Amino acid sequence: MKKQRVVVKIGSSSLADSHGGISTEQLSDHVAALARLKEDGHEVVLITSGAVAAGFSALGYPSRPVTIKGKQAAAAVGQSLLMQAYTEEFRKYGIVTAQLLLTRSDFSRKEQYSNAYATLGELLNRSALPIINENDSISLEELTFGDNDMLSALVSGLVSADMLMIFTDVNGLYDKNPQKNADAKKYYFLPEVTEEISSLAGDAGSKLGTGGMKSKIDAAKTALSLGVSVFIGTGRGQEKFVDVLKGKGDGTYVGNAPQKEMKMNKQWIALHSLVSGQIEVDAGAATAIIQHGKSLLPAGVTNVLGFFQVGEVVEVVTQQGRVIGKGQCTYSAEELRDVKGMQSQDIQVRGERHSYEVIHRDHWVSL
């Protein structure tokens, strides 16, 4: 089997004991299976939940806290305990681990996003095993990923993974809740995440079973858009992750056909950047951008909405108001208002400008 880059997401339900804390037996089982992947020459990134579960009892909570301050306090204590447990287990296999704690703002800020990309690349080149969790102890509720499922999808795209494995306590996706319906049909393979599949998931306590299944389907859809194949399921034993790569996993495979990966810069624009304004374009410019892959030139701009600076991300809309994409603008809003509708040869050179493109195609994503 050829060397692959794999992101494995392990949720709290796959780590917890009967009291809601971390099961050392479960953790050891996961580490042994991850070590087998490394032994076979694969590159591995681990996305792990479990900080709250690892820390709540040490703070005297009788059960997992439900308040934000309680969860964040438990995560602050539990993250170091969780990382210590992983490090000690991986040391038995001679594997060096590295900890990365990420927040949503690390993805929305271009420089931090690029730094995360460079750091992960260097760690993998050095044969280390990055262990990533959301920085739950400081994350603002409105700025979180929502869960580690989406974090795992975004990381899998960032590192250009071949596969994302989302491990949970349910062995795949079903058309009904298998715990309540004996005739529930399991999906062994889905070529894509359709609206029908998304609607089956619904919200917590919906048709597909556990409350976390919707987030897993949303994560799968995001990963697929970034060119990463997905597995959602469960398993035990040292061979469980290797079996997934061999097509023998106990779960559902989603979109395992080869797809074109999205470059790091375009991932940031598409999924993480904050939009600072809008540019309205005529029909000819819209066709040139979408159908022919051209850059946006000032001649095609009909209106500029908002206030933005050079390098900030803007939406591009048609004259009917339909959003067709977004990209990094090489003009400020003030500059663009001065030159909109003008031919490139008629625009006076401003400062050190070497290009007249409003948005270069390398810094554009269609929506």
From Swiss-Prot:
Keywords: Amino-acid biosynthesis, ATP-binding, Cytoplasm, Kinase, Nucleotide-binding, Proline biosynthesis, Transferase. It is found in: Cytoplasm. Belongs to the glutamate 5-kinase family. One of its GO terms (biological process) is L-proline biosynthetic process. Residues 276-350 form the PUA domain. Pathway: Amino-acid biosynthesis; L-proline biosynthesis; L-glutamate 5-semialdehyde from L-glutamate: step 1/2. ATP binds at residues 9, 168-169, 210-216. This is Glutamate 5-kinase. It comes from the Bacteria. Pfam families: AA_kinase (PF00696), PUA (PF01472). One of its GO terms (molecular function) is glutamate 5-kinase activity. It comes from Bacillus cereus (strain B4264). Its EC number is 2.7.2.11. The keyword Amino-acid biosynthesis applies. CDD domains: AAK_G5K_ProB, PUA_G5K. It catalyses: L-glutamate + ATP = L-glutamyl 5-phosphate + ADP. Substrate binds at residues 49, 136, 148. InterPro entries: AceGlu_kinase-like_sf, Asp/Glu/Uridylate_kinase, G5K_ProB, Glu/AcGlu_kinase, Glu_5kinase, Glu_5kinase/COase_Synthase, Glutamate_5-kinase_CS, PUA. GO terms for cellular component: cytosol. PROSITE patterns: GLUTAMATE_5_KINASE (PS00902), PUA (PS50890). Catalyzes the transfer of a phosphate group to glutamate to form L-glutamate 5-phosphate.
